[in-house]
């Protein structure tokens, strides 16, 4: 038991040296010529421990280096409750107007949260609200760090996985058949009820279950455009996975739509960059992905994406090292956030004045991905370089052995781990070193 206590206590010894080093480097951020950002970025604040971290990132790692207008929206649970969630709608509309949004992790309340925060009602997921208004596709991509082991060692390049988060099982109607009877599916064209189509689905001899689901051509087409846009942005090939051999009309619609969009709008651009697009059956795609070294964008239907995004995240090592971005079909409108939650357990410790070792990397990357997109849209090369430098600073810290507890437990670093704020100090120090190369 004594050995365990010593092991838990020792890791924080690295912190004092890390903080002192940061103070010696602070002058370089003051001498850095600030980047002028021409157009606004929508900033959406969040909840709990990620909200605490979010403010530090903004004040320590972003604002000292640039003149930027942040169109701020507080999406913390209390603000959403106070405005009857109108603040979330307003934030989404602001993203549509300004093209770039950067979001902190937020609480999606369940019954316990409604009671904890004395909420008026169980508000919907702000991510879902924003996604529906923006009509975009969410893509998750791992942050690769050499000394963080992967469960699939062969994945030396990132897999960027897109989930078509509309329709299918998640908007289905299901039922329990209480006994023998006929199950039918019907469609009545609007304005022409006499053209009603009815299909016999199954003749039940006893009790059972049934489900009906749908998707729309507009949503599938938007999903296709978002996927091709992401592949072009990442300069990676794109794969779509379905089961069209079984669902010939349903999944066949996805396959045909993607092929049409590719041929009409993206084939030439892909070929110029040496990229390709392929459709694969979902089972074959999973097998090929496992054998591959990564390095592609994977467009998944709703259920497949729900499952495979978590599989991919875990296989790369940690959900705390996953980025999440939402891309509109136009390729311009963009929202980024961390792929994880609000880290409630650490927040409870923080409120009690206890030290926490919370991983801030995904939250930092939410800022960098949004700033880089703003830079690309505005033709602001210095902003893009700054975003890349901040990402490199995070990675270099971990590769030097400066990391939070979650990554320490994965890497077994001999240096131990630092606390939440010491890691952010170390990132700033590393960033100042990186910025020497930015004119």
UniProtKB/Swiss-Prot annotation:
Q: How is the cofactor bound?
A: Binds 1 Mg(2+) or Mn(2+) ion per subunit.
Family matches, as SMART domains:
Iso_dh
Q: Which InterPro entries match?
A: IsoCit/isopropylmalate_DH_CS, Isocitrate_DH_NADP, IsoPropMal-DH-like_dom
- What EC numbers are recorded for this enzyme? 1.1.1.42
Q: Which PROSITE patterns match?
A: IDH_IMDH
One Gene Ontology MF term? magnesium ion binding
Reactions the enzyme catalyzes: D-threo-isocitrate + NADP(+) = 2-oxoglutarate + CO2 + NADPH
Give the matching NCBIfam families.
nadp_idh_euk, PRK08299.1
**Under what name is this protein listed?**
Probable isocitrate dehydrogenase [NADP], mitochondrial
Q: What is the lineage of its organism?
A: Eukaryota, Fungi, Dikarya, Ascomycota, Taphrinomycotina
